[in-house]
Design a protein with these regions (language model features):
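Polybasic, lysine-rich low-complexity intrinsically disordered segments
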Residues: 11-15
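Bacterial N-terminal signal peptides that target proteins for export
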Residues: 17-27
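Bacterial N-terminal signal peptides
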Residues: 28-36
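Sec/Tat signal peptide C-region and signal peptidase I cleavage site
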Residues: 38-42
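Alpha-helical cap/lid subdomain in secreted, periplasmic
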Residues: 96, 118-306
Length: 306
């Protein structure tokens, strides 16, 4: 029996050591969880094999527009005959996403040319395409087209029933303004035609990029966008109107004016355009590549087909 106190003492010591060990483990775990994550530059560099695997995975990403047939409506920035760039934005999209391009953009055209381009698309390809991208508006600004209004209003009778027997009442009634002499009227005419011609085709509108000096001889000198046009309207008013198309006509709008980052108003940004001294209107290859990257990322969030 004389060993009993000794055994009890040893047991107490073991218990204390076990508790101390558990406390240390708990403390270490808490410190680990509380420790801030190391910044990326402190992490172990990837091996060449890991890099190759990630690049392969990126290339294999299934973009929703990959391999689709897309029609492009627009002006000189879309026109394949304009030599400011060897590859247009739609050409880069063709390379990167294997998109088949049907290009109808013509230099100098304005929003009132969209119905003609739509008719040509229908004549050449019928219904055998997936989507339409519209990149238009800079020439409407340059030619001083008034902005106009989206709607006209009348007071009309309409039958209404709201928790009581129906009755005829007078209410304001909106109608799309189909004025071919204003920007919004032209857009309404174009979108009305497209929505009825192709009700189940994805239509995407893009805002015009920033613009600076363009000088092509004595009879074609276009000041930069910091000057009002002949109507006393600044360029950004046209951009704002085109952005509104999304809600008026239920179409996605890619705001290239902001998202592309192209800014030719400063000399530093002129490197993305054709000629720093005379053409800061038309992007060069680098500018078109930047536009295409922006468009590709924006399209990744949109279905190409209904």
């Amino acid at each position: 029996m004389r060993f009993l106190p000794y055994l009890c003492t040893q047991k107490r010591i073991k218990n204390k050591l076990a508790m101390k060990k558990q406390t240390m483990i708990t403390l270490a775990l808490a410190l680990t969880l509380a420790m801030p994550t190391l910044p990326a530059f402190a992490q172990k560099a990837m091996s060449k094999k890991e890099i190759a695997e990630k690049e392969k995975a990126f290339k294999n990403l299934q973009h929703p527009w990959k391999g689709k047939k897309v029609a492009y409506f627009g002006d000189s920035i879309t026109d394949p005959r304009i030599k400011a760039s060897k590859v247009k934005y739609w050409g880069f999209l063709q390379d990167w996403l294997s998109i088949t391009p049907y290009v109808y953009g013509v230099s100098g055209r304005q929003w009132n040319d969209i119905p003609r381009q739509a008719d040509l698309l229908q004549k050449e390809h019928g219904d055998d395409f997936d989507a339409i991208l519209i990149f238009m508006g800079t020439n409407d600004y340059n030619n001083g087209v008034p902005i106009g209004e989206w709607y006209t209003e009348t007071f009309d009778s309409v039958r209404v029933a709201l928790h009581k027997p129906s009755e005829m009442v007078q209410r304001r009634h909106r109608h799309f303004a189909m004025d071919k002499n204003t920007l919004k009227g032209r857009i309404n005419i174009a979108m009305s035609k497209l929505k009825q011609m192709y009700p189940t085709k994805q239509i995407v509108v893009m805002t015009p990029v920033h613009r600076a000096l363009f000088a092509s001889g004595d009879k074609n000198i276009q000041p930069d966008e910091m000057y009002e046009n002949v109507r006393g309207i600044f360029f950004d008013e046209y951009v704002k109107a085109i952005k509104e198309v999304g809600n008026v006509w239920a179409v996605p709008v890619i705001d290239l004016n902001s998202l592309s980052g192209l800014f030719p108003l400063y000399d530093a940004g002129a490197q993305m355009f054709n000629k720093p001294n005379t053409d800061r209107l038309h992007p060069n290859d680098a500018g078109h590549s930047r536009m295409a990257k922006t468009i590709m990322q924006q399209l990744s969030a949109l279905p190409c087909v209904f």
